[in-house]
């Protein structure tokens, strides 16, 4: 059995030794949609019972030094199991790179789908509003987690978080960039000059959006967010930075430029879905957060996303991406930089 990023025989042997209770692995398939860490479905059988697991591993090829840490993802979903934040069941972590060529972890398969575009699901206006409100409520729940009580007191350094984030993503840009973009350099300087006073410390997801959740869609029932996934950039930090990045992905009616960004789906254009400002206001009601500096955080979200997309583009140029949809992604970077400048100049 040949699947990019998986050494099947070694994985089967490791699972037999370390997680025999899940059954014998019978098949593997790449789950589509991921442009960062790779996600696979692992089918198993124990007696007459079939079960599905999910395996997460870093991407192939160019990998940034502080990104794609499987231990962090594993640790945070393990800590959140049993809290008000829905996450998949943690199953096992493997840090031995000899097994499949990189660290990985296994988690339970969640019945649900990543909803990105209107083609993925038909929603009534009532269901669209309920789903967007629930997305805001879960973000508030993440930020309300008592991170010390769940064992994440040392999961990050919230003091000076935004200043370090600006420095970190600037360094990542230098490592990943495939071209010179003077407007990116000007943006970095503007963000440093506009750095707001520190917000409260909270657990932050780092890449929160609807298609990083799994939504159960059942006939006759309202859509239900069953799990938040893709915790690779989670840490302790400023919760409004999480909100700002979510709004970076948001596609509002009349925003034609957003359609040119391959990193954004159009699910938020569904009639009834909250627009970006409505989403932010609902989050503020649920969390009690002060959104006075939200424009800065939206600009920072575009800045951060530009670096992430440039890293994906670099892997595509090297021929190291797995899956489809990478050929035009590099064109999104200058657009994201321009949108960040516009957020600073004009607001949300």
Question: What residue spans do the PLM features occupy?
Answer:
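All-alpha amphipathic helical-bundle segments outside canonical DNA-binding/catalytic cores
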Residues: 156-157, 289-301
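Activation of the activation-loop gatekeeper triad in protein kinase-fold domains
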Residues: 229-234
